[in-house]
Amino acid sequence: MVARKLKPSRTASPSRVAAQCLSRVLETRDEITHGHAARVGVLAARLAGLLGLPAKRCEEISRAALMHDIGKLVIPLEIIQRPFPLSQEEWGIIQTHSRHGYTILSGTGDPDLELAAEIALHHHERHDGSGYPDGLKGHDISLPNRITAICDVYDALRQNRPYRSGMSHRDAMRVIINGDHRTAPGQFDPDVLSAFQGISGEVDAYYTANTDEKLHGHVTTGTTLDRILKASW
């Protein structure tokens, strides 16, 4: 299946402006979360195109995926930035970010923000039904969420976190494909996983060119999501 190239619009819609503003708010509070969100948005667009979705839908998914962690605005920073593994109670608090994100983004009537609300709510659902918050399984999970889920996990594995160093591309792909104590092979849609493996080299190159250090201050100084997308592939 041939990937479709994104053609960013020059006119920012209200929902696009909202996505950028919310992303900047999140960056101001937690730079780690922001760099992660920006990369997930771009990777989701690329993967959606590879799966045959039209360019307009790829852009919509990208903008929505950019806000997938917006619910972390409600989570105490001392938990998000804790320099050691979380307790079971703290992990339970982290998991509430999906419902908080849905609450923040839903009810506007704007199709883009409603998609963002859906992704915020269900990007941690798993194909095998072991995810949260609703334990959805298989195609009960929307395709935008199945796409965002694998991009989210890949980027989280690569990224340095307060309590651990990021993985190499090779190790991150090994975990995604084979599983470990955090993941299982059955948690991803097989078709989405296959497509992601097909662009493994591109994904590695994109991440290497857009680490947290290289993205620092980039979006908040006037660079729009359109320009990030245009420069991605």
Per-region residue spans from a language model:
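Histidine- and acidic-residue-rich, metal-dependent catalytic cores
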Residues: K5-W233
